[in-house]
Every structure is written in structure tokens, then in C-alpha cells.
Amino acid sequence: MSFRSVILRAWFSQRERSIDRFRRRPVETQERMFRRLLRRGRLTEFGDRYDLRHIRSVEQFQSQVETFDYETFKPYVERMMEGVRSVAYPGRVSLFARSSGTTSDRSKYIPVTMESLWWNHTLGMRDVATVFSANYPKSRVFEGKTLTLGGSCSREGRNLVGDLSALLIHETTFWSGWFRAPRTETAIIPDFDEKVEAICRECVGERITAFAGVPSWNLAMMRRVLEYTGKRNL
């Protein structure tokens, strides 16, 4: 077992007890998160408008806070993109995931906070890996790196805007390079073909044991890797 695998499995094992507690107490876990979200929401304009400070139950929340579609919530998003602080989240939000509009012609901008990236994506990936490691202790997937094929992002004023995958890659550079390939600079190249060529040059000598990203994108990349190396399989 490699040093990388030993360290990762030790990191995962610390999380197993928490995951087991979530399994055994799902309602309590959700109630605790509900209270946390209320505490955070009270510090915002949104919280003032809907009087989150005095909400004590899910039923009360449902009766006081209306249901939003994107167009209804859009004014909040626009003000956050203008740099206004504590609109719907405490402090300033400077990351925005851009989605292709499915209900209108224009793209939608989804506010993304560092707290959200950490709790939902970074720890979420850790939890998936923790469960996998516990169920398949003999797997060698952690012996190498995960090749992550994401989208791209760019600066729009003071904000960083782009695919959620690119925002996640961009904001987790300080630790993830140890078990993820390619380098961040390569991973967020805007042009797909250029990115794939750079990945071929950079990663064919790496020990890749897992792939992450859109399956069709990965399939196209794998085909190019086979052409690049002259191999018949990976």
C-alpha cells in the first residue's frame, strides 16, 4: 500500500463515525442543519425580510418563506454580483456558477460560497470516498491520482464565474494537487481540445486510478489519450 493510500485511508477513517451517526439519526441531523441555516440566514437582508430570527420550526419556515423560482430570486443574485454584502448570505459572495438556461434564453448565475464548496463538495467527496473505502478495503483506487476533467471559469469584474466543476478545482488547489491531476492551470483551460492535448502531455506518465467529470467528456479524452500514446487500452 502506497504512502498516499495510507494517509487517505487514515483521513477517511476519522469520518466514518460521523457518517454512521448521520445514518442512525437522520432527522436529528437535518434539524441541526436547519437551525444552522437559520442562524446564518438571520444575518442577511433575506433573513430580515422573512423574519428568520423568530422562526423556530420547519412548519413556521414553510408558512413564512415563499417558494422561489430563478426569476423570482434573480434580483438577489444580481445584487450579490454587484458586490453588495449580506444579501442572501453573510458577507460578500464572489463565486458564481453559470448554468445553461433551460427555462429561458439566458444563462443562470448561481451564487457559490466557500462554505458551500467545503460542506457540500469537498466534504461530500470525502464522504463518498470514505464509504467506498469502508466497503472495498482492498481497492487500489487510492494508490494513484484521480484525473478530473472539468469546465472552465473566468473573471467578470471582481467575480469568478464559470462551471461549478471549474470553481471547485480553482478553489481547492492548496491540498488537492496531491491526489488529483492535471494541474489547476491545465484543468481550467477554456478550449476543450486544447485542454485534452495539455492533459495528454502532462498526465500520460502519471498513475491514474480514477476519473471524475462528465462521462462523455472523459470518453472523448480517453480516445485522444489512446491516439496520443499509440496504446490499445488504458
Where is each model-derived feature located?
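Nucleotide 5′-phosphate-binding alpha/beta core
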Residues: M1-R98, S104-L234
